[in-house]
């Protein structure tokens, strides 16, 4: 059974994201003094006592302004409310009741979802009750004075929330979801892909660059296995970003890469690979994440039977360090090949977690040596590769034991990695190779002996 959902509703800059961070004991929601920082609806795990629930944070609601993407924000709030068990409408106790609060309350009174009023910014316990009393006029029941920053009053509020949630049932323990981060430059179609995958508008889609500021987690199931999809803010050159909510969104995007199992790097088919795309690809490789390259907006490209292989060759030439990643040409607009993303991502994760026996590794290395011997130095010393073994997964990592790592240049090291890939597979995941020489092995053995004596 899915966890019940608590929707956070309110006008801009009343402290919704601060309250979400308080309820979920995290700093996932972006907090900034500028109104309207949260645009999409974002989900986090919350708990109180022995109950667990989902908290959905929505964009600031405005009913009398249709500029930019405010209509889409209102639609996101509608969708959040439709799936919620309880709605928390957040108001500003220091400002008192505003016309916007009254408009939101009028709308909420038409909804079937039970609603509670949380009067935020009531830092003073004595004044808080007086400030909250004004909000009885909204017609939504008893207002709860709280301070989202300090936590005052949130316990009473949560007790009331739990009383409105559906009865608790024994739930089987869920499988750990596969974490998939959807990353890319602004306006390459990340949110459109997320919406196409989910079959509903989970993220605001707009031609305005940088529409998504939060990382948006979406849970869904494919072939009996849970997934968590993370749509990130578009990542730009650092010098082009001000130190505001967009800057924090970009930092959140890099953290999303770190906590992901697989990254979907979205490339704009019309723009091709940019320098920023290359930097993102480098970040994925440095962090050792599995990857699928998605070339979006393929429907907008004039093409014939030769176009796809030609474009793939051009793109791979600029993303040569991700030559192990599968490339997929999609259109979020038409849905073309969107479902294939899951199959490729699942395969990449499987390879990312895979382990191979030492005997199989050495069979591949033996064949590689028979085709091409290690190089010889100017002094006449030839490199010797004795054996190898896999020492880790996520990503697959191998230690190769040699006479002297300095005798193995980059060209031969790349050759060995290619042979391991050809012999063992590992499509969609980076490999890490560690080259260890005799002196290093001897030092490690001596250290182990000393530790055994001390033990």
Curated annotation (Swiss-Prot):
GTP 2 binds at residues 184-191, 231-235, 296-299. Residues 354-439 form the KH-like domain. One of its GO terms (biological process) is ribosome biogenesis. Keywords: GTP-binding, Nucleotide-binding, Repeat, Ribosome biogenesis. Residues 4-169, 178-353 form the EngA-type G domain. CDD domains: EngA1, EngA2. GTPase that plays an essential role in the late steps of ribosome biogenesis. PANTHER family: GTPASE DER. HAMAP family: GTPase_Der. This is GTPase Der.
């Amino acid at each position: 059974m899915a966890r019940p959902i608590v929707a956070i509703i309110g006008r801009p800059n009343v402290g919704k994201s601060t309250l979400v961070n308080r309820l979920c004991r995290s700093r996932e929601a972006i907090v900034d003094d500028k109104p309207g920082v949260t645009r999409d609806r974002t989900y986090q795990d919350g708990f109180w006592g022995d109950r667990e629930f989902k908290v959905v944070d929505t964009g600031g609601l405005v009913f009398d302004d249709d500029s930019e993407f405010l209509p889409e924000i209102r639609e996101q709030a509608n969708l959040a409310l439709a799936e919620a068990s309880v709605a928390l409408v957040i108001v500003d106790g220091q400002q008192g009741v505003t016309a916007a609060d009254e408009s939101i309350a009028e709308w909420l009174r038409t909804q079937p979802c039970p609603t509670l009023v949380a009067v935020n910014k009531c830092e003073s316990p004595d004044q808080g009750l007086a400030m909250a009393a004004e909000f009885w006029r909204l017609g939504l029941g008893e207002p709860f004075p709280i301070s989202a920053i300090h936590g005052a009053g949130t316990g009473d509020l949560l007790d009331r929330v739990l009383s409105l949630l559906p009865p608790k049932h024994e739930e089987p323990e869920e499988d750990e979801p596969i974490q998939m981060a959807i990353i890319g430059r602004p306006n390459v179609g990340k949110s459109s892909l997320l919406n196409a995958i989910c079959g509903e508008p989970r993220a605001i889609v707009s031609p305005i660059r940088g529409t998504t500021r939060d990382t948006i987690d979406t849970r869904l199931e494919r072939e009996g296995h849970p997934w968590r999809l993370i749509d990130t803010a578009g990542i730009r050159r650092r010098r082009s970003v001000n130190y505001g909510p967009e800057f924090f969104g970009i930092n959140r995007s890099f953290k999303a890469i770190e906590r992901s199992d697989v990254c979907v790097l979205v490339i704009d088919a019309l723009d091709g690979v940019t320098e920023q795309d290359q930097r993102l690809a480098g970040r994925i490789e440095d962090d050792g994440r599995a990857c699928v390259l998605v070339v979006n907006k393929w429907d907008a490209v004039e093409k014939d039977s030769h176009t796809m292989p030609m474009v793939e060759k051009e793109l791979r030439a600029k993303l040569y360090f991700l030559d192990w990643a599968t490339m997929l040409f999609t259109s979020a607009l038409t849905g073309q090949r969107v479902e294939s993303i899951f199959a490729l991502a699942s395969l990449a994760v499987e390879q990312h977690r895979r382990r191979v026996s030492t005997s199989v590794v050495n069979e591949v290395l033996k064949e590689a040596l028979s085709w091409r011997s290690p190089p010889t130095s100017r002094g006449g010393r030839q490199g010797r590769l004795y054996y190898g073994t896999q020492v880790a997964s996520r990503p697959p990592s191998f230690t190769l034991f040699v006479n002297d790592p300095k005798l193995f240049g980059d060209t031969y090291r790349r050759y060995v990695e290619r042979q391991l890939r050809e012999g063992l597979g590992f499509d969609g995941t980076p490999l890490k190779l560690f080259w260890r020489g005799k002196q290093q092995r001897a030092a490690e053995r001596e250290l182990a002996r000393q530790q055994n004596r001390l033990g």
